[in-house]
């Protein structure tokens, strides 16, 4: 305790602490994740509703009509339901990704990321991105599970209304849901329900996101140094949007599986699906819903992912530069 107070009393010590590469990556990554997810929270809510509903419920009328429906039924608060928990989850989730990625750069591949002349190969980028994606999932998955369940607790899903999940007049809070899931669904096994399909989606998504962004950034690094800051920031926004869109489109079917496995215990039969494994889910969706079933909610997700990834990369770069130049 005395050591902490001593550090707080010495501004230079705080600066030196924050300017360590791992701490810069943690702080910038966490802030970037929280800001970017808040910006697109309404699309995140609607995307989850589209993913877990049956084909006959009212949220099938389109992205913006679904957003309007949520607003009319639940108000502005409904558009951001679960976002507080999402920010609590996304700060360490995003921070862990950037810390592990930077650690892979410097410790594993001995590349100085601040030197524009030193770059990872595409294979190294994919490996580092996959590793940081896996670490972030394991570290924060229970919060992701609870966030998904909170998102659909108050939704007007007629099939879910008939299940036990809607038998209460007031939705449970974060800690109540965590406690109930742990107690009623097998302890840690319940809290990590769906972690396998989640990892199958997140690991390649993060790998592609980092690899595409860094490759595009490398293309523009020489010209962007001489450009005004607004042009450089616009370029970062653009390539961030591209990297997120490409990665999400390729890996989206696994994101759909992730959400469905997360809500199985809330009334999967009533929602119209029940799976015994990832392979069973893939086969069942293909037979019952066709190829389009694998991409249900993709449009809403792209409305979320493209601006979210763009903002995330830009905020990360800006915070990193600000702390380094402090």
Swiss-Prot record:
Its main location: mitochondrion. It is a multi-pass membrane protein. GO terms for cellular component: mitochondrial inner membrane; mitochondrion. InterPro entries: Mit_carrier (IPR002067), Mitochondrial_sb/sol_carrier (IPR018108), Mt_carrier_dom_sf (IPR023395). The keyword S-adenosyl-L-methionine does not apply. The chain crosses the membrane at residues 24-40, 84-104, 126-143, 195-213, 237-254, 297-316. Keywords: Membrane, Mitochondrion, Mitochondrion inner membrane, Repeat, Transmembrane, Transmembrane helix, Transport. Signal peptide: none annotated. It is found in: Mitochondrion inner membrane. Solcar repeats lie at residues 20-107, 120-219, 231-322. GO terms for biological process: 3'-phospho-5'-adenylyl sulfate transmembrane transport; 5'-adenylyl sulfate transmembrane transport; adenine nucleotide transport. This is Uncharacterized mitochondrial carrier YPR011C. GO terms for molecular function: 3'-phosphoadenosine 5'-phosphosulfate transmembrane transporter activity; 5'-adenylyl sulfate transmembrane transporter activity; nucleotide transmembrane transporter activity. Belongs to the mitochondrial carrier (TC 2.A.29) family.
